[in-house]
């Protein structure tokens, strides 16, 4: 019955254009980055779509015509995990996840214009991905990554011997990271070659581990590292990879290096920017990222932070000469933005970089020899940039992006010219029908110390003469932001279309507004950010007539979850009808149970035992704060969240229950800091939206809104009375 009700609601909303439902949101096609062929005629991208009826997510690969934006199907084979251009016309190399080698993958070669006529070049004896290719004479050299055994072999889970005991024994950190207990395997970059025999290529199955010879090195670095952590020179002879500094404690410091190594592994990899090294700029000890060779292979650009234990420090562009002892050069080092990715133009004279700027991921250009005070130029495009690739040898790039109003924006951007639209998902996908920039607008308010930005997101069919309850959404990080980008988890438009106007603030600590605003949250989690939120809420109450703050709700995840817990004990907590806290800290001293100690040791100005007062300052569980609690609160926490233990959520719920405050605890034993599985995501939305709709009055004003009873999961309740009923 629940499934049928959801289907009917979805059809009703879609046909009348009244709402964007969680089912629409979860089942909308998800498209990956579009990668153009060498001639700049076609681009290939991955696409998947969840089917609620069949409970599966079939996937495949499509081709995008770069002249007219037409899309055609390349393959519907879900086992094809990645495709990359061979560098020869429309020929491609792809990885197939099913192979004759158990636990391995197949390397196949085909032509995008006749994909079914493929042949197998060889097998890799283990999980392997992230292919990058370069011609090297009559061979094609490649690199990719997988997990390494301690001996340096590619790890094959299917072939691994089962341990006689489940014990884990540690003599050092990490014990666990993000969602995984750290084991003996680690990520490594492997190299190999495709050899040409006649008109076909073959692979002999031999891989060289380029990382394992450097003791304690790892690349790509978990949990979010990928193919952007390494690069292959255009002649196929040299590989660059990023690893945390192998000689330093990884849980306490963010310091990482860019290593160079021959493709054949004939020498051990060496760092070009070692801490206090002869080439490294003075005082630069932070995290490195995005290594990329110049087209001629003589230089390498990368990004690096200065501070050794601060993951949200400002990145600066660095350029090093390959095979030289000359000092590394810093480029546009005074630019008050933090680049996220960098690429060279085909002539090696210009750098294209992405960076967050005023809550939008933008594309910029600058000369490769720019001075410190140079300000990069913006390239015009819509939404936020996820990735970009040069189209042939031109100055134009193919951008894959998204926005608050569309989950896929493919467009061509050229410096000094208007962007050219190829494909915008909201104009094609029925699930996204009606979404557009018309319902999004920025809001600037005087905060505690400076002007603070927020996004206002309005529902479908918004009428300025009507009044809508406030949904006050607080982002995580805390060094993060609500950007003009699509979220597959916390999506403001899904909330708005229940009948709210969403206000999504970027308070002190947010990124993309200059490094000072980001840095100012240090040791001030409940200070300036909270004051910013109060001022934004007051501005909305006093100046925006179509927003009803009397029946508003507040919700947040991670740092946003902490802030909701903090708000519960403050005056602002009494201004909301309901609260939602997802994976937020509760007890100040429990932060020591996190995985990345550098994070808390930076944000609280010291270690747990040397600066304990800083950890206790923003403790949501203080008795004097708990005494003020009264607002109904939904608490969400998952078992595989190793950023902060599930015990935080349980403890918070315990106190809410003992105080007799209407509350509910939602737990996913198979989810992490995030909820990503489709059926779990649907339940999450049913519970979260059902909770706020109940207390805000939306259930009464909008009969089509989600109710708690829409969720088919049985509620567990073994208590007849609250503790304080006795």
From Swiss-Prot:
Q: Which residues are glycosylated?
A: 96, 252, 605, 699
The entry's cellular-component GO terms read: extracellular region
The Gene Ontology biological process terms listed for this entry are:
proteolysis
- GO molecular function terms noted in the UniProt entry: serine-type endopeptidase activity
Q: Which stretch is the leader sequence? A: 1-19
Claim: DNA-binding is one of the keywords in the record: no
Provide the residue span(s) of the region labelled Disordered: 269-291
What Gene3D superfamilies is this protein classified in?
alpha/beta hydrolase, TolB, C-terminal domain
> What keywords appear on the UniProt entry?
Allergen, Glycoprotein, Hydrolase, Protease, Secreted, Serine protease, Signal
Would I find Hydrolase among this entry's keywords? yes
Q: Where's the active site on this chain?
A: 558 (charge relay system), 641 (charge relay system), 673 (charge relay system)
Source organism superkingdom: Eukaryota
Q: Which Enzyme Commission numbers does its entry carry? A: 3.4.14.-
What does the sequence similarity comment in the record state about its family? Belongs to the peptidase S9C family.
Q: What is this protein called?
A: Dipeptidyl-peptidase 5
**Organism listed in the record:** Arthroderma benhamiae (Trichophyton mentagrophytes)
